[in-house]
């Protein structure tokens, strides 16, 4: 759990006294304890000289109404306070950096988001004046999205002249050359295939590529929202939500 991670990284911490559901780890053999200590040290080294509460990530892969995430909020809040963060800064940091949730039901995701916002607002009455960006999502299915049409509309290789994707009769002017050799095409192809039945498989879906590849593609596509033509912008708006959930599923978390 995230609480156990914190205590192993900070053995002298007293925050566990505030955690109602904290369970003291069972005593381990010397060999196992060495392995655990090595893992904890590796995780601490990722942040520098000590574990940074802003880097701790918690995912509820079937978040429902958000009960577990709300409990995690209290746990994380104690960590931030112990490190001397200002109370008014903590709610936004937790919601935007620490907590992640997925569900197959959009109503459940809405309830979880609402529960977290209300929990955070107890600590910062001004929070909703500039609402934080939550990492809670209801998984979307790809539906009838057509890979070839999306790729042609995106025109990432500028194989067609801008504004001439189609002729007056709607037939495609020309096909992009060898899209199968483009890593971006392969990523989009994977995303569309993985999420074809997302409402059935939910967070059991395992992404094939590292998180960074989906993030890089998302950033590249988002640039087209400012510079692209009408077809490019429409294609980006269809793909970005799918890439966001791909990023959440590909991401490595401290606690799940």
Task: Spell out what each predicted region is.
Residues 1-255:
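SAM-dependent methyltransferase catalytic region
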């Amino acid at each position: 759990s995230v609480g156990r991670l914190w205590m192993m990284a900070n053995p002298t911490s007293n925050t566990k006294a505030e955690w109602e559901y904290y369970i003291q780890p069972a005593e381990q053999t010397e060999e196992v304890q060495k392995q655990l200590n090595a893992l904890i040290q590796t995780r601490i080294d990722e942040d520098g000289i000590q574990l940074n509460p802003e880097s701790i990530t918690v995912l509820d892969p079937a978040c429902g109404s958000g009960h577990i995430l709300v409990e995690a909020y209290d746990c994380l809040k104690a960590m931030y306070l112990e490190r001397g963060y200002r109370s008014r800064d903590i709610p936004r940091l937790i919601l935007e950096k620490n907590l992640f949730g997925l569900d197959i039901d959009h109503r459940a995701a809405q309830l979880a988001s609402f529960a977290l916002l209300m929990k955070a607002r107890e600590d910062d009455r001004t929070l909703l004046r500039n609402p934080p960006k939550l990492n809670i999502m209801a998984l979307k299915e790809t539906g009838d999205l057509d890979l070839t049409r999306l790729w042609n509309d995106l025109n990432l290789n500028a194989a067609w002249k801008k504004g001439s994707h189609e002729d007056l009769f709607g037939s495609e002017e020309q096909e992009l050359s060898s899209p199968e050799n483009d890593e971006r095409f392969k990523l989009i192809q994977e995303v569309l295939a993985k999420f074809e039945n997302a409402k059935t498989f939910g967070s059991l879906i395992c992404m094939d590529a590292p998180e960074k590849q989906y993030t890089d593609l998302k950033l590249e596509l988002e640039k087209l929202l400012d510079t692209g033509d009408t077809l490019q912008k429409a294609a980006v708006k269809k793909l970005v939500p799918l890439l966001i959930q791909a990023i959440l599923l590909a991401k490595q978390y401290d606690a799940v």
